[in-house]
């Protein structure tokens, strides 16, 4: 803007959007001592779950544990508002175990609203930001709202979700909206484009909701909760067990598939009205029928939206078909033959900024002090949003306080993997976190997220002194228990030794340490408990953590060595102002990609699409030659 507006108030940081990214970002900056303003279109929809009311799942649960370990909120609120919890992939190794909580969506929003509204240093208010105020150096110094109110600040975090230029579709009918019943954010996309950002479109969708009083559960397969409740948070003060509810499983039928195939042309994508890319790993039901034409049936999960609402979420059944057809489709599912639809499914397309325009700190490359987090960066999922939110919040606070910003290496956390992928790879579809995206998943488990990240959270000031004491006490217990298991031995001829041989079917030669016993296949800590050899002072989670560390010690040590070896080369910094076009040994594609993305390290450069190993070698040789020339110049001078 050419002339500065009259600022109504001044803050250190302004966060635009109060979804899952925005709440984590605002809480982080406020807790780190920044006076923070959190602006939202609707104070009654803070941390709303517009799609599935659930947190966690494969790879996503690891993100939640990591955010919690850093001092974030998503895990704590999920633990306080769950209606069902299950451990997914329990029959596989601990690297891919995934805790998933079905949450009460209204309670979740209310609890998070209470948290942000009672956070010191944080003001939450309504407002639609349409413009950014920059100084002469293209550094952000404020925002302006649709109704002309301006606020001064030193940093802005954009966490706008699906609201930027949002448009929802049901069949060929559409309207401007960020979510059903909520108007879209207008103006900010145009501002960002005017400032030189690349702005593109993505699409997502949500299924219909039906009235649970109209559903016949006897025709479905119950999906009960786990008997042993597990927790996202490492803070025992939020571990309150509550009554749980069942989810249910039904399946599509030949009639479902027939109706979809006959009416594909009526959907926004197949009808040609929307060409934005949707999420590959959360496809619409019509995409499933087209892409997996040989499959006779698809699983559909029926999930409660809360304890005190009749609404059921029909997971796996999002669609862009017209509303009258949606009811016909729903009634082809066993158990839903007489269902009443309370809300139709819809698709939503929205603007986003490809995240290659951000540094791994999540600050944009074009504008100092401007950060982006969540769906505006091209991700899908509450957990991915929360992870980016806390990183953007940490770094916005450090930017304001003139402290060095923090980059999360991909080999140390799923958060690091997520952000490295976003800032390095050219993604043209909504990005979802998967365990397969991490090369280091055996080390990056849920159970050790606090060991990996809580020291950092404490060092930067996000983890409180009380939380730090809880963490340290836990580490002391784990160390003491590991030592006890190493030194406690049982003899084959003793009654307990004979009982264990009988229980496991595995012989004990003369005597065996409990640690060695736990290393054996099929032997778990519960066996020690059963025979009076366990430690009653440990929580179930701590017993599990000790067992994993012992049972997989060899694999973990090997992966740790690989990480250290790779890190030595990966972390080699690249000059921010390096002229890649002046390096003739690089391919032209590599020069273009490296110039556009401007990676901070050799490791990041190696993961850019179009940059091959030969280019990395050429880059290393060039840097070596430049370093030698500088050394010679220094000696000669």
Swiss-Prot record:
InterPro entries: FAD/NAD-bd_sf, GIDA_C_N, MnmG, MnmG-rel, MnmG-rel_CS, MnmG_C, MnmG_C_subdom, MnmG_C_subdom_sf. NAD(+) binds at residues 278-292. Keywords: Cytoplasm, FAD, Flavoprotein, NAD, tRNA processing. GO terms for cellular component: cytoplasm. One of its GO terms (biological process) is tRNA methylation. SMART domains: GIDA_assoc_3. One of its GO terms (molecular function) is flavin adenine dinucleotide binding. Its cofactor is FAD. FAD binds at residues 17-22. It is found in: Cytoplasm. It comes from the Bacteria. NAD-binding protein involved in the addition of a carboxymethylaminomethyl (cmnm) group at the wobble position (U34) of certain tRNAs, forming tRNA-cmnm(5)s(2)U34. Belongs to the MnmG family. Homodimer. Heterotetramer of two MnmE and two MnmG subunits. This is tRNA uridine 5-carboxymethylaminomethyl modification enzyme MnmG. It comes from Thermosynechococcus vestitus (strain NIES-2133 / IAM M-273 / BP-1). The lineage of its organism: Bacteria, Bacillati, Cyanobacteriota, Cyanophyceae, Acaryochloridales.
């Amino acid at each position: 803007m050419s002339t500065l507006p009259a600022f109504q108030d001044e803050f250190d940081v302004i966060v635009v959007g109060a979804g899952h990214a925005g709440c984590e970002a605002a809480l982080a900056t406020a807790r780190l001592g920044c006076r923070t303003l959190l602006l939202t279109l609707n104070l009654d929809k803070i941390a709303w779950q517009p799609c599935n009311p659930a947190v966690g799942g494969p790879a996503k649960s690891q993100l939640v544990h990591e955010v919690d370990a850093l001092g974030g909120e998503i895990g704590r609120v999920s633990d306080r508002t769950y209606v069902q919890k299950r451990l997914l992939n329990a029959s596989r190794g601990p690297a891919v175990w995934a805790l998933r909580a079905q949450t009460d969506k209204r309670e979740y929003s209310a609890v998070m609203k209470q948290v942000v509204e009672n956070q010191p240093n944080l003001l939450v208010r309504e407002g639609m930001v349409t413009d950014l105020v920059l100084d002469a150096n293209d550094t952000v110094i404020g925002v302006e709202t649709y109704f002309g109110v301006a606020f001064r600040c030193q940093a802005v975090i954009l966490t706008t979700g699906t609201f930027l230029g949002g448009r929802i579709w049901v069949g060929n009918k559409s309207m401007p909206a960020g979510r059903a019943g909520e108007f879209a954010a207008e103006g900010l996309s145009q501002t960002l484009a005017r400032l030189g950002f690349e702005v593109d479109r993505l699409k997502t969708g949500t299924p219909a909701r039906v009235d649970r009083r109209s559903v016949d559960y006897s025709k479905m397969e119950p999906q009960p909760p786990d008997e042993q409740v597990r927790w996202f948070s490492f803070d025992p003060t939020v571990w309150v067990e509550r009554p749980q509810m069942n989810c249910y499983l039904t399946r599509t039928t030949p009639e479902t598939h027939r109706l979809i195939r006959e009416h594909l042309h009526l959907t926004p994508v197949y009808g040609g009205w929307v060409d934005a890319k949707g999420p590959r790993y959360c496809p619409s039901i019509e995409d499933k029928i087209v892409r997996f034409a040989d499959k006779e049936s698809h699983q559909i999960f029926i999930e409660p939206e809360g304890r005190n609402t009749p609404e059921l979420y029909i997971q796996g059944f999002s669609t862009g078909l017209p509303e009258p057809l949606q009811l016909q489709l729903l009634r082809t599912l066993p158990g839903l033959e007489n269902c009443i639809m309370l809300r139709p499914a819809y698709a939503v397309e929205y603007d986003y900024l490809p995240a290659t325009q951000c540094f791994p700190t999540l600050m944009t490359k074009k504008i100092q002090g401007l950060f982006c987090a969540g769906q505006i960066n091209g991700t899908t999922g509450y957990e991915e949003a929360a992870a980016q939110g806390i990183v953007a919040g940490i770094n916005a606070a450090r930017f304001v306080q003139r402290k060095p910003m923090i980059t999360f290496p991909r080999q140390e956390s799923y958060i690091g993997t997520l952000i490295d992928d976003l800032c390095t790879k050219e993604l043209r579809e909504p990005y979802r976190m998967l365990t397969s995206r991490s090369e280091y998943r055996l080390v990056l488990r849920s159970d050790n997220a606090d060991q990996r990240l809580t020291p950092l959270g404490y060092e930067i000031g996000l983890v409180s002194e009380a939380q730090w004491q809880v963490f340290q006490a836990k580490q002391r217990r784990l160390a003491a228990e590991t030592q006890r298991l190493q030194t406690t031995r049982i003899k084959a001829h003793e009654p307990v030794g004979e009982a264990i041989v009988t229980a496991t079917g595995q012989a004990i030669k003369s005597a065996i340490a409990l640690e060695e016993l736990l290393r054996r296949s099929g032997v778990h800590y519960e066996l020690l408990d059963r025979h009076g050899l366990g430690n009653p002072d440990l929580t179930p989670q701590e017993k599990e953590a000790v067992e994993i560390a012992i049972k997989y010690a060899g694999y973990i040590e090997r992966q740790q060595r690989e990480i250290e070896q790779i890190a030595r080369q990966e972390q080699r910094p690249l000059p921010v102002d390096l002229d890649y076009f002046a390096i003739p040994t690089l391919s032209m594609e590599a020069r273009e990609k490296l110039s556009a993305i401007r990676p901070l390290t050799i490791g990041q450069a190696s993961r850019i699409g179009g940059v091959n190993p030969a280019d990395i070698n050429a880059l290393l040789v060039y840097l070596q030659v430049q370093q030698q020339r500088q050394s010679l110049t220094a000696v000669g001078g």
